[in-house]
Amino acid sequence: MSEQQHHARKLPTDVEQIPIVWRYELLKYLRSKRLIGSVIIAAVVIALIFVVPPATGNPYSGKDKAVTLFVTGPQGMSISGLPYPGNAGLINRSVVVASSIEVFQDGTLLSSTDWTFSSATFLGNIVLFTHNTTGHTYTATYKWHGTSESFASGFVGFANLLIVICATFFGADAIVSEYQARTGYLIFPNPIKRASLYLGKFGASMTAGILVISMFYGVTAILSLVSVSGLDKDFLLSFAFALEYLLAVMAIAYLISTLMKGTTGATVLTFFLFVMILPIVDSIGSISGFKASWSVTFSAGVMSNILTSPYPTDSISEFSRAGLTIHNYVPDPTTSALVMLAYAVVAIVISMVLFRRKEMTG
């Protein structure tokens, strides 16, 4: 009976073999400590970015006490409904908690009916007085915090390098290691197509990378909610661009892995291609006056730029004494998304074809 059941068993189909390879590759990352190492790197960087500014005297939030308000005279702006236009004191903080504001006139607490707070002016955060302020000194006590935009930007700036690290750890040697370590002699003769093997490996690499990037963005979001009481409205869009950049970089890493003959060369080339070589080309464009919209590393800038409101535009900086003109190019979000997707698709197709044709030698 058992022998009949044994003969009745069917081999998994090509599609069913993909998740099997996927699972074993993920287990390999766990055994080799690569996934854990990537998470540790991300955690250390998050800790440093979060701790260093407050430790050096730049906290994310706080409370200012008895801060002198420099009140403008009647020649200032005219506010509808106020009998004394222009009597306004500026609070020089990014975001002020309106409910926490206390205003003092010559050391005496003013009633909230004698002033109003507004953050919707070209001056920023101001206290508008409903009476003549001539001859008086005004101070204010209030809670404040930084903007969610600036907080998120400080963290997302590292996401680019973290993605390259993930591609280096999980993709650079994914293919070439089977040839260098001669494990291909054990794997390739099995009844599994190269395409299934490739897709399983690539899926595992992307899963590991997504776990690391998701952890990075997730912790950043929590810290933002705790530290500045909010999350930038484009934060999730930045996360989406980060995942697309991960897809493009991972695909290129796999292409390099199919072309190289050794794991060391593939790892080094993958890392420096995205950290040094392509960024140098992008910088040359800023000096020469051509916009490297085709560059995947240039397009990656959209991850942090999308957090800026309004979205930045191209500009030119003139240095007349040096006779130098610097073009400050900014990647367009739509173009960047298409460029990264194109790199991913082309690299995956080419690397898969090369992998199917590559044979064991030696």
Q: Which residues fall in each region the model found?
A:
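Helix-loop-helix units of permease transmembrane domains in multi-pass membrane transporters
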Residues: 174-206
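Alpha-helical transmembrane segments of multi-pass membrane transporters/translocases
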Residues: 14, 309-362
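Aromatic- and glycine-rich beta-strand/loop motifs that create alpha-glucan
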Residues: 2-42
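Extended beta-strand solenoid/passenger and fiber regions
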Residues: 59-114
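Secretory targeting signals
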Residues: 9-12, 39-42, 46-64, 143-174, ...
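Short hydrophobic, aromatic-rich alpha-helical segments embedded in or entering the lipid bilayer
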Residues: 289-322
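Extracellular/luminal ectodomains and secreted, surface-exposed scaffolds of diverse proteins
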Residues: 99-135
